[in-house]
Amino acid sequence: MMFWRKLPKALFIGLTLAIAVNLLLVFSSKGTLQNLFTGGLHRELPLHLNKRYGAVIKRLSHLEVELQDLKESMKLALRQQENVNSTLKRAKDEVRPLLKAMETKVNETKKHKTQMKLFPHSQLFRQWGEDLSEAQQKAAQDLFRKFGYNAYLSNQLPLNRTIPDTRDYRCLRKTYPSQLPSLSVILIFVNEALSIIQRAITSIINRTPSRLLKEIILVDDFSSNGELKVHLDEKIKLYNQKYPGLLKIIRHPERKGLAQARNTGWEAATADVVAILDAHIEVNVGWAEPILARIQEDRTVIVSPVFDNIRFDTFKLDKYELAVDGFNWELWCRYDALPQAWIDLHDVTAPVKSPSIMGILAANRHFLGEIGSLDGGMLIYGGENVELSLRVWQCGGKVEILPCSRIAHLERHHKPYALDLTAALKRNALRVAEIWMDEHKHMVYLAWNIPLQNSGIDFGDVSSRMALREKLKCKTFDWYLKNVYPLLKPLHTIVGYGRMKNLLDENVCLDQGPVPGNTPIMYYCHEFSSQNVYYHLTGELYVGQLIAEASASDRCLTDPGKAEKPTLEPCSKAAKNRLHIYWDFKPGGAVINRDTKRCLEMKKDLLGSHVLVLQTCSTQVWEIQHTVRDWGQTNSQ
């Protein structure tokens, strides 16, 4: 084997030719001699010649065999060489990707070793961003601060991405009339990421039958984001080249707030039905038909789809279960349990009557105008959906959730355009209370811990809205509570509320303490609801956020009887179990339990901090921030 590999190529070729020539001569000679010996002439040869030629023929035969063996050896050597070459090639082909993979792994290891987690405490990177370089992390975090969601990821996702169909399977069996009203979709935005708006538009176009979708109207409430100017205009032109006249954009010259932006879109709409949406949404399949069919059945109904949630960090969709939209006495929105009347229908596709709506709604365009559209006096954000819901219910319409219409809504981690919405929420809540809540409006003041008189909050001129209420001959808020939202329970026995201080140290206030937990504490005074206290003429002392609902209980200050420290117990349960929850109190006086006769007081612990105790009454007295009617002396601290 090694011998053949070492032969020079020219020598190898020459040797091969020589052997071939010799073989030809041998065979030729052998043939001649054989012919002479056994040929057709059959001549007799002398004996010595006969022997001589026989020996030659024998030798030639041996030589032929040897040469044949040599030829076979050469063939075998060549085949072995080919096998070796083939094996080497195959080995190289197999090893090459392994070596490449090992090299890649080494590079990745080096890469990970050099990368740092630049923002270990950022909520953006809890479940996302493991493979980002440091430069990518910085870019993603900057966009997160700017928009309140993962705009970096949004910019990489397809605009026409697929999201899970979250409808109940029975919704897929429903059929709708072939003739349905036309639809105007209104998208409200301020300083959204461009890719978010584009994805909303794309989902609407792709998942709404073109015969139903008349227009998409974008309302920009004075964005400062540069890409929402020229770049957005260019995108709209591209959409309109493919779908002529479908998209329109209206830009406010100044910030007007959510309610007025929705009114701007409504005023520009021309279809039979308007759907007013946030721009950070993706509509799901079959979202429009249930809306249009229901409004075609009843023009006085305001409807809302079911929300699903798009996570702010991963953009994954979380399915939300069907619920109705409610609110508390601060007019904060929330989800409430489904009404028993709907459950008894045994039809999961049926519309659900709801006390309120969230931020997305659809309505007959003319009916929405007849009842006054949205209250343009609501500023910035908050309460406008509750105001509309109260007006619709009290003025002859109804509000419903449609189980078979679903929209995915992108949650924000924070609202960068308004980091503190408290002032706007308070102001808007008082405006709603003054217009629509009649003798129960005080509950909003109590919940927000605002003085009933001289609140110092300007909620705007409400005369035109009061005139509208009179014109529409609207029902009372008491009717609404009894017939639509019996969950809310107004209270009329509260005579003192707000922060409560012991005059030993007016820098600390009574506080509900850690949650979960039921131990009240003394803590540095602040304006959050954990320090709200509500004293009733009947003797209860609520501590913490005011609930005043049928399905949940406020927490009452309780004397446990033997222990030194007071507790907070659910009022309804405590009353049922005859716990010591009733107190005598007047502003500037002691707080005395009616049963145990012990006083609520405070003392310093070993660390010098004030702690609450129940003990024999000394000279300690308490003040409460606000009083109602003629109870005690009016205070405002």
From Swiss-Prot:
Q: Which reaction does it catalyse?
A: L-seryl-[protein] + UDP-N-acetyl-alpha-D-galactosamine = a 3-O-[N-acetyl-alpha-D-galactosaminyl]-L-seryl-[protein] + UDP + H(+); L-threonyl-[protein] + UDP-N-acetyl-alpha-D-galactosamine = a 3-O-[N-acetyl-alpha-D-galactosaminyl]-L-threonyl-[protein] + UDP + H(+)
Q: Where is this region: Catalytic subdomain A?
A: 180-294
Provide the topology term for how it sits in the membrane.
Answer: Single-pass type II membrane protein
Tell me the compartments it is located in. Golgi apparatus membrane
SUPFAM superfamilies cross-referenced by the UniProt entry? Nucleotide-diphospho-sugar transferases, Ricin B-like lectins
What EC number(s) does this enzyme carry?
2.4.1.41
* Gene Ontology BP, a term: protein O-linked glycosylation
Topology: which residues are Lumenal?
Answer: 30-637
Q: Which residues form a coiled coil?
A: none
Pfam families assigned: Glycos_transf_2, Ricin_B_lectin
Gene3D superfamilies recorded: 2.80.10.50, Spore Coat Polysaccharide Biosynthesis Protein SpsA, Chain A
Annotated glycosylation sites: N85, N107, N160
Q: Which residues bind substrate?
A: D221, R255, R412, Y417
Pathway noted in the entry: Protein modification; protein glycosylation
The main location is: Golgi
GO molecular function terms listed in the Swiss-Prot or TrEMBL record: carbohydrate binding; metal ion binding; polypeptide N-acetylgalactosaminyltransferase activity
Ricin B-type lectin domain: residues covered: 496-634
What family does this belong to? Answer: Belongs to the glycosyltransferase 2 family. GalNAc-T subfamily.
What is the name listed in the Swiss-Prot or TrEMBL entry for this protein? Answer: Probable polypeptide N-acetylgalactosaminyltransferase 8
From what organism does this protein derive?
Homo sapiens (Human)
